[in-house]
A protein has these predicted regions:
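Non-catalytic linker/capping segments at the edges of enzyme domains
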Residues: 1-53, 73, 78, 91-95, ...
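Short nucleic-acid-contacting surface segments enriched for D/E, G, S/T with interspersed K/R
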Residues: 59, 94-102
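Compact, glycine-rich, soluble single-domain proteins
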Residues: 63-66
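Short, structured beta-strand/loop micro-motifs enriched in basic residues and often containing a Trp
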Residues: 82-87, 117
Length: 167
């Protein structure tokens, strides 16, 4: 529908190649997805010189992307925004010769607020590379909101500036 604004980012910021599982039971759910690691991924060229590693924040962004998709899959209409997380632990890394990143996200709460046109999802995530757990993220939060998209880029307009979102 025309009001459907939720979408994945375009490559190279898209951190997901496929969704293997998605489910919901009440306010809880689960989403499992993967991304194939490529030797020539853009971030290996610049992070870091002579020591290529995927930035950990891109793994966190992948979790936010998937939680946003979960909201859309549940019927949320609007534009998705990452709203934060309570904890992030990195205890491994992603290198150019690794094969697959796997996201396992347990949605601990999904709330649709139809009066305001908002949906919120909160999830706990485990990120694995080639089967080894390397990141844990607690309470990653994404909201889907109506009437915040900036669809006339690059022109200045009512929504062309950032700053704090209205409460």
């Amino acid at each position: 529908p025309p009001e459907f604004k939720a979408r994945f980012p375009l490559p190279p910021m898209l951190m997901v190649d496929r969704i293997d599982h998605i489910s919901r039971e009440g306010v809880r759910g689960r989403i499992v997805a993967e991304r194939d690691i490529r030797l020539d991924d853009w971030f290996f060229q610049c992070h870091f010189l002579e020591d290529p590693v995927q930035p950990g924040c891109l793994g966190v962004d992948g979790v936010w992307q998937l939680i946003g998709f979960y909201c859309a899959w549940n019927g949320a209409l609007g534009t998705g925004r990452a709203l934060g997380c309570s904890e992030v632990d990195f205890f491994g890394q992603i290198r150019p010769h690794d094969k697959v990143v796997r996201y396992e996200i347990d949605i601990v709460r999904y709330q649709d607020l139809p009066q305001s046109g908002t949906a919120i999802a909160i999830g706990d995530a485990d990120i694995l590379v080639d089967g080894d757990s390397i990141y844990k993220i607690k309470r990653a939060k994404v909201g889907v909101f109506r009437d915040i998209d900036y669809n006339d880029y690059p022109w200045p307009s009512q929504r062309s500036r950032g700053g704090k979102m209205a409460e």
